[in-house]
Amino acid sequence: MQKREIQVMIKSTKTKNQRRISLMDYCIRKLLGLTEENFITDENWLETVTENHEIVHKVKGTWTNTCTSCPYCSSKNVIKHSPMEHKIRIPHLYGNKTLLELKVQRFICKDCRKTWVTDCPLVPKNSNISYDLACQIMLYLKENFSRKTIAKLLSISDKTVERVMKKFKIKTMQRYNYLPKVLCLDEFRGVKTQQGKMNFICLDGENHQLIDILPGRTLHELISFFMKFSRKQRLKVKYLVMDMNASYQNLIKAVFPNAVIVVDRFHIVQHINRNFNQLRVVIMKQFSAKSTQQKTLKRYWKLLLKSSDELDEEKLRYNYHFKTYLTQAQLVDKLLSFNEVLSDAYDFIQELRKAYEKKDYEAFMICIKEIPKQLPYEFKKKFEVFKRFKNGIYQAFTTGYSNGAIEGTNNLIKVIKRVAYGYRNFENMKLRIKIIKGCFFTPVNRKSL
């Protein structure tokens, strides 16, 4: 009895170890993403070698399946044939390149003598990139990495990254079945095309979702693009947020009859500061290069663009140009004393900016109409654009819409271009921008990869 109990205990312990090894093997296969029942690992299924001064892990296994009829002649006279070996790229193991050396079962038809292999769900047909590695490539493409960097991280080629990127469908607003209430329009310097150096971009002004990117910004291209949307959708657009571009005004008459223009508030301030800055440069160059006037007007130009209410009137700092202690307000007074025209222009833009900050449309337009006569003609002429866009400025003061989101997208595009060292193909740039912006992209079914 005691011997029999010992034998039973030994047998039970052996079975437990076998189960433990089997469970461990399954967990390792689960980490590798190789849990299919038809995948059978070899006895020594993991091998580590060095190729071209690089550590490579090789996972060895066999893919078995059954086949009852010939796909060519439908004959039932089918037998197994010698397996076909495939080297499949899978995600890195311990940060090193990993290959799956897979033997796929082949079959031969005795009637037509044709051979074929069974389908393997680990890899697309006629490809050596596994589905898991393709998904990992897309995760990297979602981040702002260059294609060559992704290829280096995953031990693949740049063209492989490009092919995988193009095999993913992008759900965009190009279905032409929806337009938002607020439409933001702008242009950016992207890829030089036949239409020009500038590309067009538009997005939803409320949820900041990218709508589309066009290779050109001409009026004919914009009208032909937006006319693809139904009239019902085009009538839903109530506001067009844009800079002071005259060509965009014609879009309202031709495409969006119910929309009104909203001038972006940033461009209003930018136009004011730019005009004053150009006048400052003209006046500065009237003085000699080594004079205190030119040096100080050139050095402290930011103080002249600063709001007078934000100037420090208490803290004294030594100024080596004037050899005395001055506050910011006193320094600005010194600069304005160099030229009377500069002083009048400064007072004018300060009144204009105060009206802008208070969103007082009437006071803003009164300042434009009553611009001082002693100011140069070129300076006054540049403010005539506010009269042409007075309705858009009114909407900018009364509504809260702006092009802040689209300007941020333009900055993101600059970063994408800089990381990629520029783009030569417009479609590749457009696709990458939409992937990084998360424009409703979803991968297609595994079998279509």
Task: Please describe what each predicted stretch is.
Residues 196-197, 201, 213:
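Active-site cores of enzymes that catalyze phosphoryl transfer or operate on phosphate-rich substrates
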